[in-house]
């Protein structure tokens, strides 16, 4: 996916759009949107990856206000799977932490998907086409990953992950 959007579960009327900007070298951009009544307004575009970006996924942490994680393939870094923590402050101000590589095998992170644990702050699960899964941990503005675990020996095409809200 080259554009994803999600509502912020912690702030009424706020959502985030993450996309690649094909007019600017396919760089990765994020934009906060706000819905008020029947009107939509947007903040400024913020770049999280200046190089060629694709296969985006994004999720808000339902337990930590204003925090989200974006994952993507970074073609400006040999196509590695990369993650970055974002924060929203005020109405539309987005800041990003440092980028973290979660899979250094180029072309193995197509179609990744992430989901935060619904009852544990700062923890999420990431799966990707390589048939691998990781647990991600957000600390401040950085993210770290557990060693990857294989969940299928084949190619896991369009993987999607959801977290069990009862655990």
Regions found by a protein language model. Give the residues of each.
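Extracellular, repeat-based ectodomains that mediate carbohydrate processing or recognition
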Residues: 1-167
């Amino acid at each position: 996916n080259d554009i994803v959007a999600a509502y912020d579960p912690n702030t009424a009327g706020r959502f985030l759009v993450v996309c690649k900007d094909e007019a600017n070298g396919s760089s990765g951009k994020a934009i906060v949107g706000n819905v008020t009544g029947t009107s939509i307004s947007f903040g400024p575009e913020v770049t999280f990856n200046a190089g060629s970006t694709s296969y985006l996924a994004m999720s808000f942490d339902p337990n930590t206000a204003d925090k989200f994680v974006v994952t993507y393939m970074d073609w400006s870094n040999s196509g590695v799977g990369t993650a970055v923590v974002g924060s929203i402050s005020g109405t539309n101000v987005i800041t990003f932490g440092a980028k973290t590589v979660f899979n250094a095998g180029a072309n193995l992170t197509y179609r990744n998907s992430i989901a935060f644990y619904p009852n544990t702050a700062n923890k999420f699960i990431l799966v990707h086409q390589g048939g691998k899964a990781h647990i991600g941990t957000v600390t401040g503005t950085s993210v770290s990953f557990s060693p990857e675990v294989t969940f299928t020996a084949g190619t896991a095409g369009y993987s999607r992950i959801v977290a069990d809200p009862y655990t």
